[in-house]
Amino acid sequence: MFKLSGEDKANVKAVWDHVKGHEDAFGHEALGRMFTGIEQTHTYFPDKDLNEGSFALHSHGKKVMGALSNAVAHIDDLEATLVKLSDKHAHDLMVDPAEFPRLAEDILVVLGFHLPAKFTYAVQCSIDKFLHVTMRLCISKYR
């Protein structure tokens, strides 16, 4: 598994300063891209309107990005921070672990699009590593 360096952590925190307070907008767009591009992801929300601009999409986007904001706030103890979320996704929601990397890709796209001046090669690499670590921890309870 990737290990986040001090520089990675600083890069992630610097970018996340621009995400904080806008979790629903960033999350809505990232989830919207995933739901549009990957039809089977709709199965987790059979009774929800997942169209662009829907309340359900904004609400869940805010939850996802809020969880990532919490992870950034506790970046030095990600395993303990994400244990409940991991349990929930593995045992209650039973989300296919293959969906996590897909969402991570869409989050990278959204951050890069909205924060181009901040999204240098090094920052992109740090965010990618952070998302990889968080996603691996979120699927760790699937065993």
From Swiss-Prot:
Coiled coil regions in record: none
Tissue/organ expression: Red blood cells.
SUPFAM superfamilies reported for this sequence: Globin-like (SSF46458)
PROSITE patterns, per database record: GLOBIN (PS01033)
Pfam families in UniProt: Globin
Domain of life: Eukaryota
An example Gene Ontology CC term for this record: blood microparticle
Residues binding O2, per UniProt: H60
Keywords in alphabetical order: Heme, Iron, Metal-binding, Oxygen transport, Transport
Globin domain ranges (all copies): 3-143
GO biological process per UniProt: hydrogen peroxide catabolic process
Binding site for heme b: H89
Single GO MF annotation: metal ion binding
Recorded family membership: Belongs to the globin family.
Role played: Involved in oxygen transport from the lung to the various peripheral tissues.
Quaternary structure annotation from Swiss-Prot or TrEMBL: Heterotetramer of two alpha chains and two beta chains.
Protein's name according to its UniProt entry: Hemoglobin subunit alpha
Species name: Ambystoma mexicanum (Axolotl)
Biological classification of the source: Eukaryota, Metazoa, Chordata, Craniata, Vertebrata
Gene: HBA
